A protein has these predicted regions:
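An active-site-proximal structural segment forming one wall of the substrate-binding cleft
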Residues: 56, 114-135, 163-194
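Catalytic domains of carbohydrate-active enzymes, especially glycoside hydrolases
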Residues: 43-66
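N-terminal small/glycine-rich loop or linker at the start of catalytic domains
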Residues: 16-35
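Active-site beta-loop-alpha junctions enriched in small/polar residues
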Residues: 35-37, 64-66, 133-137, 198-200
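Conserved beta-strand positions
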Residues: 32, 61, 195-197
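Aromatic- and acidic-residue-enriched carbohydrate-binding clefts of CAZyme catalytic domains
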Residues: 23, 66-122, 138-172, 200
């Protein structure tokens, strides 16, 4: 018969957790999948306007969900001892997104469009919660990795290759994913009240 010791969190940690939970409980969030389908800045602003009208507090914007539809001005990445030029990464991501779904309305939002959108949302009192999915829902990123010369980035399950999931045993693919997400996280840092970072 084993006795389990009960360990209580320090009062400060418990109080902080309660404050965070209370704040999150007051959130009313609308989620838009702007990764699978392209949404123009005007469409997103209209969604923000409607969200405000209906009492929402935040817009959860999936820019990386199968497709990757947000491009920074500088997309250069250093992964280990390899540097990928910005234009090469942009072209590979754009091609990867088009391979997932070549949306006739557009491919991606630019950095200036996103910065403007964040400012617009803030002025309306709407927070922006950006998301780039990993290790799954990465179709465009996996295709981009292959175009950039990373071999076999896709997870393989008994001979069946996943179109969406990175192989967590492929160190180069994992490092590339982390570098890409770090790049986006650095851009969004301080621009969003809830900074979440998907890590592999």
């Amino acid at each position: 018969n084993k006795e389990v010791a009960k360990v209580e969190a320090p009062p400060v940690a418990t109080e902080r957790a309660a404050q965070v939970n209370e704040k999150l409980a007051k959130k009313k969030i609308v989620s838009i999948d702007a990764g699978r389908k392209y949404f123009s800045p005007d469409q997103l602003k209209e969604i923000i306007d409607k969200a405000k009208h209906y009492g929402y507090t935040d817009l959860h914007l999936l820019v990386g969900n199968d497709g990757l539809r947000f491009m920074l001005d500088d997309m250069s990445l250093t992964v280990g001892d390899k540097t990928y030029a910005s234009d090469d990464v942009k072209r590979a991501v754009e091609n990867g997104t088009n391979a997932y779904y070549n949306d006739p309305n557009g491919n991606h939002l630019s950095e200036s469009e996103m910065t403007d959108l964040i400012g617009y949302a803030k002025n309306k009192g709407i927070g922006l919660i950006p998301t780039v999915n990993s290790p799954g829902h990465m179709d465009a990123i996996l295709n981009a990795m292959k175009e950039l010369g990373i071999e076999k980035p896709n997870f393989n399950y008994f001979g069946k290759e996943s179109e969406r999931t990175v192989d967590l045993d492929n160190e180069k693919a994992v490092a590339f994913t982390k570098a890409l997400i770090d790049k986006y996280a650095a851009y969004f840092a301080g621009k969003s009240e809830i900074d979440r970072k998907s890590v592999v």
